[in-house]
Amino acid sequence: MSAVLKPQADLAIADISLADWGRKEIKIAETEMPGLMAIREEFAAAQPLKGARITGSLHMTIQTAVLIETLKALGADVRWASCNIFSTQDHAAAAIAAGGTPVFAIKGESLEDYWDYTHRIFDFGAKGTPGEGPNMILDDGGDATLLMHLGQRAEKDLSVVANPTSEEERILFAAIKAKIAQDPTWYTRKSAEIIGVTEETTTGVHRLNEMSAKGTLLFRAINVNDSVTKSKFDNLYGCRESLVDGIKRATDVMIAGKVALVAGYGDVGKGCAQALAALRAQVWVTEIDPINALQAAMEGYKVVTMEYAADKADIFVTTTGNKDVIRHEHMVAMKNEAIVCNIGHFDNEIDVASIEKYRWEEVKPQVDHVIFPDGKRITLLAKGRLVNLGCATGHPSFVMSSSFANQTIAQIELFTKPDAYQAGKVYVLPKVLDEKVARLHLKKVGAQLTELTDAQAAYIGVKKEGPYKADTYRY
């Protein structure tokens, strides 16, 4: 079949006939994901996630399929939706659905469907019964967590969803109001048993920290993003490979010789700059932080403002996690055929709403020409959403093994040791677990560790088996 499955089924995918293709790619990915496979082997007998009901909101890719099957192998019950309307790989969703996991993810789904699916991943049991909702959330960007918090507030006071400031907020607020009209205590009940959330990305961590600081975070949280084996690998090395993959698949453009502007020089920006420089682009960087700006300059990149670069650069990449990084006045000033894309989590880094009034011409899915009144056109990729997942398939399996090993370990930590973590607080995994994730991946790349002697360990004041660095160490 090639149509979306019937709405009454406990899933929403594009095409179940893609399951065999998805399964073949999952098998390939498993060979490149040694961390997850080692965790399965270590914990399968103990079933540490038995009894866990995990609501998952994370890009429904082949690599995520391996994560889902790892969580299930450790005993968890899982319901899953994508955290981005363009990031789903439909054959991955089909393979997971064919295995019996409720999946709600279709590449190119509408925002209305997106929020409907995000609601549906909380429906574990019958209304008013124990186990009605999840007891764990695995989040990427914080939308599932946001939904529970905003929904509970709206149950008490609908005015909190009365004044949307964007089209996405309008759709989200409408979905919340409709749910409350249908079931006035749905959000309170669905979140009643949640032990905690593990958060994948920088943007979601910002949301968690804000709620924790205000005293409004309802449950425990582990910040997976700031594990070294996530942020210094997924964010940097993953983006270093997947950014250019997305740009190339979308445009077939020659990178060499072009001026490429990277907005932001954090871990993601560093990886993007390295990738573009490796293909011999002239890389320019914008930054607000003097330390990051100096780092970029010391790497040989020209540090400029967006106003300076707008009419000069050929390729623009936003990586900041902030909003309005590329605004209307910048796009008006750009060259004809400038390429504009984003690799930050949300679509508000580029002010796409400000150019919706102009004529759009779809070149192919997720590649649009925006034609200005003077006839100039820019090429906008993935409508300002994640270019590496909208126009390609995201990060390679190996680096996602490192990220998802952290996610799995974090889920085990929160679920099995809830008393060790205080509700309303945000934690990072202990360094010993961070080092464990790294160890699980060394053999695959042929790396051999040097072992300290007793005397050496005593001299520098560490245990022979680690951890080897202070928590304040900057890798």
From Swiss-Prot:
Record has Transmembrane as a keyword: no
- Per the UniProt record, the source organism is Paracidovorax citrulli (strain AAC00-1)
Task: Detail which positions bind substrate.
Answer: 61, 140, 200, 230, 234
Name of the gene this protein is made from: ahcY
**Stated family:** Belongs to the adenosylhomocysteinase family.
The UniProt catalytic activity note for this protein reads: S-adenosyl-L-homocysteine + H2O = L-homocysteine + adenosine
**Which protein, by its recorded name, is this?**
Adenosylhomocysteinase
Query: Which InterPro entries is this protein grouped with?
Result: Adenosylhomocyst_ase-like_sf (IPR042172), Adenosylhomocysteinase-like (IPR000043), Ado_hCys_hydrolase_NAD-bd (IPR015878), NAD(P)-bd_dom_sf (IPR036291), S-Ado-L-homoCys_hydrolase_CS (IPR020082)
Instruction: From the Swiss-Prot or TrEMBL record, state where the protein is found.
Output: Cytoplasm
